[in-house]
Amino acid sequence: MLLRRRSLRMPDDDITTVSGLPVTTVLRTVLDCAFDVPPSESICIADSALRALVRPTRDQRTASEHRAATIRRRLQDELEAMAGRSGARRARAVIAIASPFAESPGESIMRCFVTALGLPAPVLQPGVEDGIEVVVYFPDLAWPALKIYLEFDGRLKYESDADLWREKKRRDALARLGWRGEHVTWDDLRNPARLCAKILALFPPEIVHRARLVPELWA
């Protein structure tokens, strides 16, 4: 076991108290993780923190995005104040894509891979209206102009036959509306080569050709 110790100067404003114990604030914790933890892990922490602070709602998306942008700017300002710290480039890349609209760690990791591949930025949880069924679907990640989507599937999503039937109807409806998509599982996330091939196969060759890896998100 390798034990590493690091000494950092901690401003009083970055310390709070929980159950009588001194701990770092939510935003400071997000920053420390963005600097020191692999991006596929720190993005989950950053997304979760933004979701807790913003409390986004689908029917007030613009207001939710505004609150998220305000918090993200604060994180970026504090990050630049620590720019000499090791891991700054990685931290910038993580904070830049942090979003309150990710609904699970699996979605966050999937988006980290998408961004690391250099693909166009996806829209999280956009509404796709189905006029026939009179319902709105919300894919996890989507590229509306291309009618491409990615969905993360955890086991809890399919606990009953009703869940399976509802998901089948959803997939059929999106296909009928001209959308193409892939469903990503934890097994895919544990196999980056397979996952990347799965994602890239969805996109037109010209977009794949223009894509450039983002090394800060592969660290």
Region locations from a protein language model:
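Phosphate-handling catalytic interfaces
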Residues: 1-100, 108-113, 117-121
